[in-house]
Regions:
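Short beta-strand elements
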Residues: 727-737
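Bacterial Sec-dependent N-terminal signal peptides
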Residues: 1-23
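Glycoside hydrolase catalytic-domain context in secreted enzymes
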Residues: 17-702, 709-726
Length: 737
């Protein structure tokens, strides 16, 4: 008994001694700030600097001497990219890095449903965690300024409020997995052409009202742990080390406590990188290393050159302590977070999430009868149509491939053709119809004319015998389409699709057009195509989502997150000279100012072909007369707007009720109206619900350049209850005191 007592006493003392010897920075029970301070105090200058730059293509160093691990990053934002080689862009060809491809963020934004954003963030976070990633490079929240931008498919549309609301749940749920969101590309990376050096100039109003709100929401509401700088310059200084946007706005005004990470190759100057707010430098020189004998990671701007400047007193020591503190904070939140879950990949839950997001994001643009007074063409009645012809390269193309850094290696991919065959069986035949080339980066295949002609002729012959034709076309992830590193060359459909559509209409009027893209396209045939569906890039379960909508198994409820101009010059960015878009290759001016998207269409009275917020359903909805809670709002008060919405059709559906606000008279130019609130409401047939929105004085403010502050001017305002930006269902006037 005595020996047992002594052993127990010895064990207790040993545990106590070990506990007492545990450094603060290694103690999970300690606050993160205490751990950061303790770790920093133990580090040498060289160890601090080593944190600030890459050690491989997708990792940055830890502090091995102190047991602090490295940070591992991965491209996103709609799937975890396959493993990349240590020193180059080649794939490592692992056998266990296949994942779920989730719908692109344009599709997520088109759901207008924050619950879908949360579901998305949770699922992609679990996959990133399973793949042992600490930082996921996403979501992207750059504003849709022009339909020519090759990277719009990665973003959340043209409206800053919609993008703000939709990015926050994604970030919050992602980070619950111990994986940092790296919100990108901060800021004004609104085109791919000349992205590495184009110098963007714009008003402070446009910056604060249009281009920054989603980033601000990501930081202040979403609690994002990292931000990725953009490639472009802003007012003469590169965005990855821009004093105004990083130090003044992000870190001082928004109190951001996370890390600023370059886009790969986005750093250009050691002094600016040291003092202007950059924390981690990735991918410098040729966007990485040409070979280890030519460049080493120690040659990066924030590596040996920075260390030498610190030793020479050319930059303050406070800069490295701030950077190292932020990086340590990120490491404690992610790589050293022992409470994080294990994660999972390509699960049935993730596939279900991808399918549901796709179902809610697909937008029914048009659904007309083929014959006068007949029924709309969609949904496709299996009993009515015995011979369904599916046409189009996009019906079978793997759209997870190409696109640049968002390219994904999937475990499963259901194509549109597969999805439609699962729904309609042997009634479905297929013709390619057009050729689109390979998904190469930096160049595009040239398709021989004889191939174009033969594929079109085959499709037309088969269409003559079909009861109904479903053309699955649009853009793809090839260069000069929806792809990083270059912008589109034309607003119209590529690969001869306009001619194909005309030819198919010439032999079969029962034509359903499905557009898979992340951008608007010109539609010279729009009045003659009875049914048009915007299908986005839908990911692993895309074919099932598309079949769900086309068959009527799911009622479409998505609405557009950006406007479809009838022609390119109807878009504000393209209504001026080339200095507005694409710039003169050196400089660029955002001449449309705050009038982006529907703000331009409304204010200039230029109707969009399909307006922001537009989307049809297989049922119908009626709106009652909106009622305000008061005739005036006090400076410290609120005002509610309530409207009844009823499903007057025969099937259940979801309607997205939108509330916009307009200022009747102001000393500065303001848009006719701006989106301030929305709600997605599910209604059974015949069901009616009341939807209430609460307005505050903040909803009425504009950014005043003279005072560099948000303000409103007392006076008369209008609240517009809308089914889209162009479909106003009711207006309420009120006064702001």
């Amino acid at each position: 008994m005595k020996n047992k007592f002594l052993a127990t006493l010895f064990l207790a003392c040993s545990i106590s001694t070990v506990s007492a010897q545990t450094p603060v920075y290694m103690d999970d029970a300690q606050p993160i700030e205490a751990r950061v301070k303790d770790a920093l105090s133990r580090m040498t200058l060289e160890e601090k600097v080593a944190l600030c730059h890459a050690q491989s293509k997708f990792s940055s160093a830890g502090v091995p001497r102190l047991g602090i691990p490295e940070l591992w990053m991965s491209d996103g934002p709609h799937g975890v990219r396959a493993e990349i080689n240590w020193n180059d862009w080649g794939y490592a060809n692992w056998t266990n890095d296949s994942i779920t491809a989730f719908p692109a963020l344009t599709c997520l934004a088109a759901t207008w449903n924050p619950d879908m954003s949360a579901k998305y963030g949770k699922a992609i976070g679990e996959e990133a965690r399973y793949r042992e990633k600490d930082v996921l490079l996403g979501p992207g929240v750059n504003i849709y300024r022009t339909p020519m931008n090759g990277r719009n498919f990665e973003y959340m549309g043209e409206d800053p409020y919609l993008a703000s609301v939709m990015c926050v749940p994604y970030i919050q749920e992602l980070q619950k997995n111990g994986v940092a969101a790296c919100v990108k590309h901060y800021a004004l990376n609104n085109q791919e052409l000349w992205r590495g050096h184009i110098d963007v100039n714009l008003s402070d109003r446009a910056l604060h009202e249009i281009y920054l709100p989603a980033f601000k929401a990501a930081v202040e509401e979403g609690g994002a742990w990292s931000i990725m700088g953009a490639y472009n310059k802003i007012r003469g200084q590169h965005a990855c080390h821009n004093d105004f946007t990083l130090n003044k706005i992000l870190k001082d005004d928004w109190k951001f406590d996370g890390c600023v990470i370059t886009d790969w190759g986005g750093a250009h100057d050691t002094y600016e990188a040291a003092v202007n707010g950059l924390d981690i430098e990735m991918g410098s020189y040729t966007n990485g290393l040409t070979s280890e004998s030519v460049f080493t990671y120690n040659d990066y701007y924030l590596a040996s050159p920075y260390l030498q400047m610190l030793k020479d007193g050319k930059v303050p020591m406070s800069t490295i302590d701030d950077k190292a503190s932020r990086i340590l904070r990120l490491i404690f939140r992610t790589a050293m977070n022992r409470q994080k879950p294990y994660g999972s990949v390509a699960t049935e839950e993730h596939y279900a999430a991808a399918r549901e997001i796709g179902n809610e994001g697909i937008v029914l643009l048009k659904n007309a009868p083929v014959v006068k007074k007949g029924a709309p063409l969609l949904p496709i009645d299996a009993a009515k149509y015995q011979n369904i012809l599916v046409v189009g390269d996009n019906a079978v193309r793997l759209l997870n491939q190409g696109g640049g850094s968002s390219e994904l290696k999937v475990k499963d991919m259901v194509s549109p053709l597969d999805g439609l065959r699962a729904a309609y069986g042997d009634k479905v035949a297929y013709a390619k119809g057009y050729a689109a080339g390979r998904p190469m980066y930096g160049r595009a295949d040239e398709i021989p004319q004889n191939v174009v002609d033969s594929l079109r002729a085959e499709a037309v012959e088969m269409a003559k015998k079909a009861d109904l034709v479903v053309l699955v076309g649009g853009l793809n992830k090839n260069h000069f389409q929806d792809c990083e590193g270059g912008d589109r060359l034309e607003y119209g459909l590529p690969f001869g699709q306009d001619e194909l559509i005309e030819a198919l209409l010439g032999v079969n009027k029962n034509l359903v057009l499905v557009l898979l893209s992340g951008n608007a396209v010109e539609m010279p045939w729009v009045s003659r195509v009875p049914a048009i569906v915007q299908g986005w890039y839908l990911g692993s379960m895309g074919g099932k989502s598309l079949a769900d909508i086309l068959s009527g198994a799911v009622n479409p409820s998505g609405k557009l997150p950006f406007s479809f101009p009838a022609k390119l010059t109807d878009c504000g960015a393209h209504a001026f000279d080339e200095l507005s878009y694409p710039g003169d290759s050196i400089k660029q001016e955002y001449k449309e100012d705050i009038l982006v998207g529907y703000r331009w269409h409304d204010t200039k009275k230029i109707p969009a072909l399909f307006p922001f917020g537009h989307g049809l359903s297989y049922t119908t909805f009626t709106y009652g007369k909106p009622v305000a809670s008061a005739k005036a709002m006090a400076a410290d008060g609120t005002l509610t707007v309530t409207v009844a919405v009823k499903n007057t059709g025969s099937i259940a559906g979801k309607e997205i009720v939108q509330l916009y606000v307009g200022d009747d008279k102001c000393s500065v130019l303001r848009p006719v109206k701006e989106l301030k609130h929305f709600a997605k409401v599910g209604l059974a047939p015949g069901e009616e619900k009341s939807v209430t929105f609460t307005l505050t004085p903040d909803d009425l403010k504009f950014y005043d350049e003279a005072s560099a502050a948000w303000k409103y001017e007392p006076g008369k305002f209008k609240a517009y209850v809308c089914a889209s930006s162009a479909d106003v269902r009711g207006v309420v006037s009120f006064e702001m005191q």
